[in-house]
């Protein structure tokens, strides 16, 4: 039996999220079903991060065990032939037995897309969060810098968070505007449940002028999520990259925001 890893991209609009749930359509369920149809084996997959309902992924990483002997090309073409149009296997490789899609990851990056215009986006409405009030991007940038480094992010965790520690390290937060779209990228060692959406929600309130630039510092000091009541819509959120130690030889995902901007 060998261990394989796969890179997956998906649109999350039609799903309850990544994780399999009874009587609800999930991405994990569809991927495992496609693996079964292709291989004839009942395969359990393990992911880098369980995305919520309507959250997308430019790169999700999974691993699984199999006895089936197929080329990587056959795995990609075969499994994709059984998947819905909005889920796609991008690559498959053999990995060392010590590799784990979640626990071997050393960092993750999320992208959030805001459409900041008086009218909603007709084409991209399912892939961004519409904010009709003009946002002060400079205030958002200044506030975001307060979160860089190692902090207790208790104020930004979701109510269902079960993490043993609420300390996380944010390496950078980049906020860019292109036409009427605002892109927020956050790279951290890991994220708490709903942490990304809650950070974005509060940044938006700061951008609207409803909260001061010091609001992020106040939330870090308070360490209580009852004060952070602003959570951004999941449809604007993308898991955009997962990072691993070089010795696992996981394919690098060269996502460049400037290429993403060309879509718009």
From Swiss-Prot:
Cited NCBIfam families: hisT_truA (TIGR00071)
Protein's UniProt name: tRNA pseudouridine synthase A
Function: Formation of pseudouridine at positions 38, 39 and 40 in the anticodon stem and loop of transfer RNAs.
Subunit-structure text: Homodimer.
GO molecular function terms noted in the UniProt entry: RNA binding; tRNA pseudouridine(38-40) synthase activity
Binding site for substrate: 110
EC numbers, comma separated: 5.4.99.12
Catalytic activity: uridine(38/39/40) in tRNA = pseudouridine(38/39/40) in tRNA
Organism: Wigglesworthia glossinidia brevipalpis
Similarity remark: Belongs to the tRNA pseudouridine synthase TruA family.
Active site per database record: 52 (nucleophile)
Alphabetical keyword list: Isomerase, tRNA processing
């Amino acid at each position: 039996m060998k261990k394989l890893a796969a890179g997956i991209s998906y649109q999350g609009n039609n799903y309850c999220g990544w994780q399999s749930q009874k009587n609800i359509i999930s991405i994990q369920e569809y991927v495992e079903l496609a693996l079964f149809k292709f291989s004839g084996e009942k395969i359990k997959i393990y992911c880098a991060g369980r995305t919520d309902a309507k959250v997308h992924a430019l790169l999700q990483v999974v691993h699984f065990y199999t006895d089936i002997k197929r080329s990587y090309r056959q795995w990609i073409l075969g499994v994709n032939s059984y998947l819905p149009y909005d889920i796609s296997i991008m690559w498959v490789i053999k990995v060392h037995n010590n590799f784990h899609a979640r626990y071997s990851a050393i960092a993750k990056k999320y992208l959030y897309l805001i459409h900041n215009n008086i009218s909603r986006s007709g084409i991209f409405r399912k892939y961004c969060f519409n904010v009709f009030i003009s946002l002060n991007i400079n205030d958002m940038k200044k506030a975001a810098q307060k979160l860089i480094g190692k902090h207790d992010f208790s104020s930004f965790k979701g109510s269902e968070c079960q993490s043993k520690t609420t300390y996380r390290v944010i390496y950078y937060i980049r906020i860019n505007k292109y036409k009427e779209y605002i892109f927020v990228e956050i790279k951290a060692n890991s994220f708490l449940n709903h942490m990304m959406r809650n950070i974005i929600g509060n940044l938006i309130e700061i951008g609207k002028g409803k909260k001061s630039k010091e609001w992020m510092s106040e939330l870090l000091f308070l360490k209580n999520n009852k004060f952070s009541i602003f959570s951004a819509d999941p449809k604007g959120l993308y898991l955009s990259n997962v990072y691993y130690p070089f010795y696992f030889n996981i394919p690098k995902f060269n996502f460049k925001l400037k290429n993403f901007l060309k879509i718009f």
